[in-house]
Amino acid sequence: MTVCKDFTCKRKRIMMNNRKQINIQYYDSPGGRLVLASFADSLCLCDWSDNPFAERNMRRLTRGMNVSFKTGTTSVLKETKRQLDEYFAGKRKAFDIQLRLTGTDFQNEVWNALLDIPYGATKSYKDIARHIGKPKAVRAVAGAIGANGISILIPCHRVIGSDHSLTGYAGGLEAKKMLLGVETIELYYK
């Protein structure tokens, strides 16, 4: 999986156009409706449509840019849907979609750490804080995870409490349970 930070990937030519376009499409998953968005050749959003922070995530996509939104498909969105279908059918354990992150350096560091959690495994917020070399930043890590706008592909659903309890999730705890179930992760829910 290739990850680019913000909208400044290796290919600066993307930035040349005056008016940029973000393409949006919906995907109905077993856990609820997702909003998918692509910019150029990257996925920049995979968010639950009923997420109370969805609007914030959309604003973050457009910060400092002259963009328009268009409902329509792109090769990135088609491929994302295909890979999500495979994931929910239990046939895909890793995604191969180029992602475009739109967070702070700290958020991007945390989101990249989430990509290291293997399919079928879970980690605690404390584990992630240690993984990025900031063991005392557990609350900040939790905040960054909560701001993840690329659910499922950046597997924030694999993060649980230190006591193995199910903790908050943008798509709701039922969606989180469902995703963990897809990956055959059994927890003792508190």
Give residue spans per PLM region.
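Active-site phosphate/pyrophosphate- and oxyanion-stabilizing loops and adjacent acidic/basic residues
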Residues: 59, 139, 177
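Major-groove DNA-recognition helix of helix-turn-helix-type DNA-binding domains
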Residues: 153
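…primarily DNA-binding HTH/wHTH and HhH modules…
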Residues: 162-190
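Regulatory, non-catalytic segments
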Residues: 139-148
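Basic nucleic-acid-binding alpha-helical/helix-turn surface characteristic of O6-alkylguanine DNA
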Residues: 2-135, 182, 186-190
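Short cysteine clusters
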Residues: 156
